[in-house]
Amino acid sequence: MSIFMTQPTLNYVSCASLADPSALLHAMAYWQWGNPAAGHVIVCVHGLSRQGRDFDVLARALVAAAQSQGHQVRVVCPDVVGRGQSEWLSDPAEYQIPTYAADVQTLLARLDSEAPLSTLDWVGTSMGGLIGMAVLGSPQFKPPLPVRRLILNDMGPTLEWTALQRIGTYLGRAGDFSS
């Protein structure tokens, strides 16, 4: 049976605090496109001030391309904690790449338990690329299977200090609105 989802489903996974595993869990939202039983999973992780729905056009195109070739795929786009539909953390100090990587590791384990993963691809934009490198390059994080393709967009292995300062100036500014 062929399944082609033209709209994503919103799902949640419970994640533990990296600093204090006995603390309350937080919910990370993720948007799922395509066949939820497909073993081929493409994870798309957004940038610092973005959300999983940023990948709607790409997810729709990936599902359609797979479908046209007779394949099934599941595209999963998390809202990193504190963004989109995900919960906020109680400790602001936990908003760091290791926390995000642990959350995505929990998500991958959940996806694998729902329908075993056979192929895993990763698309990471900016911070999403850093999270991908943390998940895939750290011995403490073990995805259910090796990533076949890692696509890094708008980032590299190093960050220039001036670029971080520039990001800090616009993220730290409150917006002015007429209403």
Residue map of PLM features:
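Active-site loop/oxyanion-hole signature of alpha/beta-hydrolase fold enzymes
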Residues: 23-24, 63, 74-123, 137-143
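Conserved HGGG/HGGXW glycine-rich cap/lid loop of the alpha/beta-hydrolase fold
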Residues: 29-88
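N-terminal Rossmann-like NAD(P)+-binding domain of SDR-like oxidoreductases, especially those catalyzing
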Residues: 13, 46, 126
